[in-house]
Amino acid sequence: MVSFEIDRNEPFTAFLFFRKDSREAADALLEELRSKKGKMTEREMADFVRTLTSGERGFKFSKQNFYNKVLGTFRFFGFIAKVPTNDPSRRRTILAYRVVTQPVLQRRPIKPSFLYLANEIGRWWNDLMVTE
């Protein structure tokens, strides 16, 4: 039987990734995004991936796996988006990865339902990543 309860004591990445190395890379990405207020340029992301491939964070993770598996999963589910952003230092528009605020209903849907699960996951993501 499927459980319709979300255990918030587990890390958010355990919900999306089953492999330990993917979870570690995803946790490192979320930590990096939090430290940069939810936005990273392509260059900052490339520097971050270099630290993963070199093993500076205590584990190694390949560039291809990171972009395809970890970042691809976050982008597929709509948690992270690649958006045009103004760069005042260069006086031009560049692409940056940004945390996406998930839409959450004011009134919780009845459970068990898919809408209930989607609402709870969105609320969990917003509590974890979105800082106003």
How should these model regions be labeled?
Residues K20, E24, M40, N65, ...:
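Alpha-helix boundary/N-cap detector
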Residues K36-K39, G55, F77, D127, ...:
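Surface-exposed polar/charged interaction patches
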Residues G38-G58:
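Short acidic, hydrophobic short linear motifs in intrinsically disordered regions
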Residues K63-G72:
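Short, hydrophobic-biased segments on the C-terminal half of alpha helices
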Residues G72-N86:
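A short, conserved structural fragment
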Residues P84-L95:
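Short, Lys/Arg-rich nucleic-acid/phosphate-binding segment
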Residues R98-E132:
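Short, amphipathic alpha-helical interaction segments positioned at domain boundaries
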